[in-house]
Every structure is written in structure tokens, then in C-alpha cells.
């Protein structure tokens, strides 16, 4: 069940020990003011329809702890300790006063927070934060963005990137060795001393063969194929022994059963590539612990292939939104029309222009934009026409403005936790990416406030100089 909190607490009502004075211009104090906690709490309470049972942690504590973790890159245990020790973080998490006598919650609760705050819930929270921030903007700027006479207006910038997961770079031999070790652990669990003699696994010999391969400085194709064949034989024997135990009415729990299915899938894929002398297979598994991760071919310098979630974002007036995400590789050009329609649902009209990379300029997207009066940036398809006079100044401005989405990617990967996703589950990894987008918008609000203070300070200094001169 969920119990509503008493609402946002002002800094003056925050109970502080004698001699402690919190500053109003602290960034965490400003972040509290920029988030519509009451509206978000109404959505969060819908996740707990039951009116009985243990009371869930308040929304401000759950979301605040997740934001703090993304901001600093703390572990679950360190996040709990930092909240216990810092009065600013406690105020951000909705505490009524500073209290360092006990931990705010157990560190394992962070996993439940990430599961409850799904990407869909975080997308709604992100939209509420954007709408709340837009209300405080100058009304003249809002009127300028509205179309006159129901036409198109505004600009949307789109691009795709990959949020890499924290996995070892996959190699066939090391992947098979890890699968073999996991299969041996499952066999140890299924075997009991009353069953008699334990099935032979040759684990010492398999380990010796694996170390012989990895300790070699140069790996030839013949050597690699021989090592893969040996590991496949060892793994085949282990799986046969596990099947024999399961036929004797032995049972595994849910987590162990899922791990066994992953091992079987790895064996099938590696056996197929070994028999057919190929290095590619559909839905290839690259990690035993995270079987949902897929290789994403990016073609970037230094990183031709990344392993993690691929995502599309859109930037409108500096506000970032997560449009699409998937662990499977896909062509981002197929999602452009969906992103434009999402813009139409939010704003009530289509954008006047779309700034995108060349990969988005296919025939379907060009005809779609032309039918709706939208200008898609970039050159036309095919060879340049004879005597064509392109507006180079317009192309240069479009390219300069399109760089904003690259800045969002850079900031999200360097400062918001998108650069290396350490979550182990598919749902929690998606939570990390969605929360990074929310943190990007909170940083934008904070930077806008600091710019306003600099402008106000400069205005006051100029007035003082005028008074001194007079």
C-alpha cells in the first residue's frame, strides 16, 4: 500500500541541529523546487492499488535516491550512506529534518525502486518536469513558438546512440568457458551425496585448456577453432549430465532455470557457427549474466561495435525526450515518423523543420515530411542536379543546431550515468537510461537558473556603477 506524504517542505521548515544553516542557493534545494512532486506522487500511488500490507517508501525518497545515484555514480550501498550523512540530500529526499541516527532504507531497496520506476513512468515524470519548467518561462517566448493560423512551427532534433552495458568484451572461447563454469555450478546444485558417484565433468582439464589458449600472445584462426571445439565438447557433456539429473525429478529455482536456458542457447549458437564456419548468428548472446544484450554495429572510430541498449532521443527547445529504446539492433530511420507524430500529439501541430543525420533521409521519410510541409535537413538523394543552387548558409545553420543533440549525448554519458550502464537486469537497465534523460532536463533547469542569477548580478553591478558616476 502507499501513503501520501505531507507535501513539499520549505527550507525554513526543515528541522536542523543548532548551528547548522542550509543555503537556499544549493543545487539540491533548487532541484526540489523544479520537480512537481505532488503531481508525480499521484501517478506513483497508482502502482500500489492494494490498501493493505507494508507501507511503501515515499515517492520523493525513491525517486530522489535514484537521481542522487545517477548524479554521482554511487553504488547502492554508498547512495544510502551519502543520504544518511548529508542534510542537503535528506532535504531533497523529502525528510522533515536532518537525522543521521539510522539508514534511510536498506541498500537492496534500490533494486525495487528501479523496478517500480519503469521507463514509462519516468517518461511521464519527465513530461511533467518539462511542462512545469515551461510555465515559468517568459510568456513572450512561448507565444513566439506557437504557429500563426494553424501552420507548422518549431524544430525537432533527432538522433540515436548506444548506452553500453558493463560486460566483458565477448569472445567465443571466453563465453563458452563462462557458460561451462556456470553449467558445472548447476550440476553441483543438482547432485546430492545420496545420488552415488558424481558425473564426470573434466573441469580441471577444461580449465587447463582454456588457460593454455588465453595465455598465448597470438591466436591463429586454427588455434581459436580448436579451443572452441574443446569447450563445446566439455559444455555438451555438462548439459547431458544436467539433463540426466533433471530426469531424476531434480528441480532448479527460477533464476537457475533461466541461467540454464541461456547456457543452452549459447551452446546452440556457438555450435551452429562452429559447424557452418561463420561468425554471425541471429539474436547472438554475448553475455551469460545479461543475455538480453546484443551487439550494436555503430561504425564509430575506435568503437565499431558496442554492446548495450540502442535509443532514439528528440530535442525540442532544449528539452530532451526518450522516444524509443531497444536492446536489439534496428534502423533508426524507421522511427522518425513516430517521433514526429509524438511531437504533433504534444504540441498540436507539426514541426516546421526536422534536423537529423543523413541516415534519416530515405524516400519514405522524405515523402512523409513533404506531404506535411516539414523541411528535413540535409541534401537531396542521388547526384546533385546540374545547375542546382543550394543554400549553403541554411545547411550550415542546420548542422550547427543539430550538434545540440550530440551535446546531450555527451553530457548524458559523462555526467548522467548513460556512459556505462551497470544494472544487471533488462528492466533496471532501461530504468537507468530513462532516468539519465530526466537528469539531463533537471540539469538544464539548474543551468537556466544560474544564468538568470548571473544576468541579475550583472544588472545590479551596472546600476551601482551608474549611481557612482552620477
Task: Outline where the language-model segments fall.
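Short, conserved catalytic/metal-binding motifs centered on acidic residues
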Residues: 26, 65, 79-83, 104-110, ...
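Basic, short loop/linker segments at the boundary and entry of helix-turn-helix/winged-helix-like folds
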Residues: 22-67
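Electropositive, glycine- and tryptophan-enriched low-complexity nucleic-acid-binding patches
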Residues: 300-346
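Basic, amphipathic alpha-helical segments enriched in Lys/Arg and hydrophobic/aromatic residues
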Residues: 256-260, 267-274, 393-470
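Charged, often Cys/His-bearing segments associated with DNA-binding zinc-finger transcription factors
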Residues: 1-35, 447-470
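Trp/Phe/Arg-rich N-terminal binding region typifying the photolyase-homology
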Residues: 47-59, 72-115, 122
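Active-site- or DNA-interface-adjacent structural scaffold in DNA-acting proteins
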Residues: 96-290
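Acidic, metal-coordinating catalytic cores used for nucleic-acid/nucleotide bond scission
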Residues: 52-57, 87, 355-363, 383
